[in-house]
């Protein structure tokens, strides 16, 4: 309806990076350029495992009611908060947690007397925060979508998909990411067979793609300014 036939660039990080990879696989003739950040071409066993524990946390909450909680007037707050805590632990790096929290107690609490460690208070905060604003079933479905992500399924595999892509593909990984490790991005670049993996340097783990704005901006600028393969370069001063 909009008459858009080709996209100058498709850019995404994390789950958005999965969607970007799917655009490349599903519409290779329409996507001129793509930037996949802190993501992958297919889910790994480790990602599926992290997601599974989150789904179980939600669906095991008695207030989930097999997903029919709205009709029953209930809400699986505890399950959703726990799922977020599990997820948030995977979003940050072990080194950041150690440097930021160590084994320090939560202010005003004593872990030896039933109180919390500081890192536990941090996770509790983020769990409660998400539970106030997110739908549990939507969380489950998004997590399941990530687990089943595989752009090579039904298309001859990851290598076949990316080797056939004629556009420009940039793939970037966060060097401290334990949810979408560097190896997942490396696999994509090897399948594409051209260029090199870009590295985002950050102590913040997977969330580095949200925090390191200057590095992301540099990647976006590189992508949108890059001429397509086969496109003549304009050289200043040459007629």
Regions found by a protein language model. Give the residues of each.
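Conserved alpha/beta-hydrolase "acid-adjacent" motif
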Residues: 154, 178-184
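Alpha/beta-hydrolase-fold enzymes
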Residues: 30-32, 36-129
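Short beta-strand/loop motif that positions the catalytic acidic residue
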Residues: 165, 171-173, 177
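Conserved acidic catalytic loop of the alpha/beta-hydrolase fold
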Residues: 1-9, 18, 28
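Catalytic active-site module of serine/aspartate enzymes centered on a nucleophile-bearing elbow/loop
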Residues: 186-190, 194-239
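Conserved alpha/beta-hydrolase fold motif
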Residues: 9-11, 23, 34, 171
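Short glycine-enriched nucleophile-adjacent loop
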Residues: 17-28, 34
